[in-house]
Curated annotation (Swiss-Prot):
Record family assignment: Belongs to the NhaB Na(+)/H(+) (TC 2.A.34) antiporter family.
Catalytic activity: 2 Na(+)(in) + 3 H(+)(out) = 2 Na(+)(out) + 3 H(+)(in)
GO terms for cellular component: plasma membrane
Membrane topology, from the record: Multi-pass membrane protein
Entry keyword annotation includes Thylakoid: no
Swiss-Prot/TrEMBL keywords: Antiport, Cell inner membrane, Cell membrane, Ion transport, Membrane, Sodium, Sodium transport, Transmembrane, Transmembrane helix, Transport
InterPro entries membership: Na+/H+_antiporter_NhaB
Role, per record: Na(+)/H(+) antiporter that extrudes sodium in exchange for external protons.
Coarse class of the protein's main subcellular location: membrane
Top-level taxon: Bacteria
Protein name from the UniProt record: Na(+)/H(+) antiporter NhaB
Any one GO molecular-function label of the UniProt entry: sodium:proton antiporter activity
Transmembrane residue ranges: 25-45, 97-117, 135-155, 234-254, 302-322, 352-372, 388-408, 445-465, 474-494
Length: 524
């Protein structure tokens, strides 16, 4: 039977995505212009919900295509403009450069990462201690590096472990070429247990980036914006956040202990003994067969790792440029000089970079259609500690839906305007800045669209291998979401004002004048 041209086009549309999914996207594209004609505000929220739906279905179809189609249509019907989308991309250029260069840079350091993490996983037999070491390490690193960089490291390590086991279990040698996406030659029981084990470590690490990232001004992009507007330096930012961030960090680690001990929310998965043996054999094989040149590579990569941490922690250059320097140093000192060998490093990050640009287009729609304005004005109508709590909650809820960088920057801009208009005092402003920072960083672990690092993990090459779907990520993050949100909320409501006063009395921080924030804000 001959296929008609329309049927052929439909078959090609979104490839092997399920039929119901294709029809759903087509339905979205048909109804959106009509909703926009009736009520642009409702149309804006409809588009945001549809975009979140494409993220939730990331394992069925990469979100770039359906999300991109929805955005292109939104541009044509006037929900936003290419110029505004371009502006949002320009504002977030550092994040895009970070993705392109830093993730590729990490790729060229994977020999060192595998060397270190294989030793860690083999030596630490206790899963609880291993989980705590992963969450603590990712929190510590995220306080100085960018969360995306830390997640890129963890993904690289996870992929390394997975491919080693997959090769050996499929009857291949460590150095054989092998397709680790095909499970045909494997025993399924150990593989499922190993997937569960790696999923646990991935999620603990991802949450760790949020715990550490909230503490310092370099931890997350929106922290820099908030510190900049408020005129705080690195130390002052850390001290002002401490009354909320330190209790949250402690309770975050306690949550890890409870989850690993009880085995709830699919945590507590152990490393199967057969897989451990393969990793031990791999470690021995690599140690025995390591040549002088390979040892030299590891030493150079360790030195580059030190440069990476020092460069990022001291802000010697923008994150993307430091990533570019890592690529240049790592490849030139490892002898990787062919274009095709360089190209492999960019495969992981570029699809996500394109997706993030689409995401910034959706942010442009949110701004142009004023989707968050009613919430912002409502929150500003409160006073005192209630206002701080409402800021924290409103930031948290909106950060679960939208990008937390956008939410944080919108709120701090609104609060700075309120300060300049004389609606709030400078001391109130400083405490609201703490509530905004913690509100955007902590509850946003609830969904992958809240944190760029979580979204990167969801759309990375490792997610389908570990069966890490949007729903599963939300479910595994749920206990952390509840604990971090509640502890952060209680610390903001009960402890923040008193603790800040104690810090003033101890002269660890000083009172600012309203003029400082105004001058800072005008400059940016």
């Amino acid at each position: 039977m001959q296929t008609s041209m329309i049927a052929a086009i439909y078959k090609n549309f979104l490839g092997h995505a399920p039929d119901w999914y294709k029809k759903t996207i087509i339905a979205f594209l048909i109804v959106n212009p009509f909703i926009f004609m009736v009520d642009p505000y409702i149309a804006g929220w409809t588009l945001v919900i549809q975009f979140i739906f494409t993220l939730a279905m990331a394992l069925k179809c990469y979100p770039l295509q359906p999300g991109g189609l929805l955005l292109i249509e939104a541009m044509f019907i006037g929900m936003t403009s290419p110029g505004h989308m371009m502006h949002e991309i320009e504002v977030n250029l550092e994040v895009l450069l970070l993705l392109v260069f830093m993730v590729a840079g990490i790729y060229f350091m994977k020999d060192l990462l595998m060397f270190l993490f294989t030793k860690l996983v083999i030596k630490v037999r206790n899963k609880l201690i291993l989980s705590l070491s992963f969450i603590f390490a990712s929190a510590f690193l995220s306080a100085f590096l960018d969360a995306l960089t830390v997640v890129a490291v963890i993904i690289s390590v996870g992929l390394g472990f997975y491919s080693i086991y997959h090769k050996v279990a499929s009857g291949k040698e460590f150095h054989s070429d092998h397709d680790h996406t095909s499970d045909d030659e494997l025993g399924s029981h150990d593989l499922e247990d190993f997937r569960a084990f790696l999923r646990n470590l991935m999620m603990h690490s991802a949450v760790g980036t949020a715990l550490g990232g909230v503490m310092t001004m370099v931890g997350e992009p929106q922290n820099l914006i908030i510190a900049d507007k408020a005129g705080w330096d690195f130390v002052e930012f850390f001290i002002r956040m401490a009354p909320v961030t330190l209790p949250v960090f402690v309770f975050g680690l306690l949550t890890t202990v409870v989850l690993e001990k009880t085995g709830t929310f699919s945590y507590g998965a152990k490393l199967p003994s057969a897989v451990r043996q393969i990793l031990v054999d791999y470690n021995d094989h690599m140690d025995k067969g390591r040549s002088k040149r390979e040892t030299a590579k590891l030493v150079v990569q360790a030195l580059i790792g030190i440069w990476l941490i020092v460069g990022l922690a001291t802000h010697m250059a923008s994150v993307g440029l430091i990533g570019l320097s890592v690529i240049v140093l790592a490849t030139s000192m490892s002898g990787v000089i062919e274009e095709h060998a360089l190209g492999k490093a960019f495969e992981e990050a570029l699809p996500f970079t394109a997706l993030l640009c689409v995401f910034f287009g959706v942010v442009a729609v949110i701004i142009d259609q004023g989707l968050f304005q009613p919430v912002i004005h409502w929150v500003l109508s409160f006073e005192g500690e209630t206002q701080m709590v409402m800021f924290y909650l409103a930031n948290g809820v909106l950060s679960m839906v939208s990008d937390n960088v956008f939410v944080g920057s919108v709120y701090i801009t609104e609060v700075t305007a309120a300060l300049e208009a004389g609606q709030i005092t400078r001391d109130q402003y400083d405490m609201l800045a703490v509530a905004i920072n913690t509100g955007t960083n902590l509850p946003s672990v609830a969904t992958p669209n809240g944190q760029a690092a979580f979204l990167f993990l969801l759309t990375s090459a490792i997610a389908p291998l570990l069966r890490l779907s949007y729903g599963r990520m939300v479910m595994m993050a749920l206990p952390y979401t509840i604990v971090l949100t509640i502890v952060g909320l209680v610390a903001t409501y009960i402890g923040l004002a008193d603790a800040t006063q104690v810090l003033y009395d101890m002269h660890l921080i000083e009172h600012h004048t309203a003029v400082e924030a105004g001058a800072q804000a005008v400059g940016h």
